[in-house]
């Protein structure tokens, strides 16, 4: 999809659908595109004032139940590889830009999930 901002996600009472307004793809590998979708979904959630950590945990569980552990792992690897993003967000945090603070929270969330990734992977291997 490419950018699952909350304003581009609709629910008709039965299914979730994505409104896709984009015409350009930045990642050609499907797993990387899915990983970016996860990152952007969480960033969109964290930028909202109504957001609760339980919502992010529900998204995590939803991805796991749908077999999305590899996508979550890829998202974590992407953020780790591009650690300069987190460093930049931390440096400009004092200005309280909504999107910057949200990205910083996403980076922290993924960093805190490393052990959970290992546990989930072990459970799948059983």
Give, region by region, the residue ranges found by the protein language model.
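C-lobe/activation-segment region of protein kinase-like
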Residues: 22-117
């Amino acid at each position: 999809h490419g950018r699952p901002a909350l304003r581009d996600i609709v629910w008709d009472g039965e299914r979730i659908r994505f409104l896709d307004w984009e015409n350009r793809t930045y990642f050609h590998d499907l797993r990387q595109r899915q990983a970016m979708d996860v990152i952007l979904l969480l960033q969109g959630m964290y930028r909202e004032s109504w957001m609760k950590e339980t919502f992010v945990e529900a998204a995590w569980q939803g991805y796991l139940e749908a077999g999305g552990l590899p996508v979550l792992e890829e998202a974590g690897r992407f953020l780790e590889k591009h650690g300069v993003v987190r460093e930049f967000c931390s440096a400009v945090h004092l200005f309280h830009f909504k999107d910057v603070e949200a990205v910083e929270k996403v980076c922290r969330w993924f960093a805190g999930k490393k052990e959970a990734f290992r546990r989930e992977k072990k459970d799948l291997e059983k």
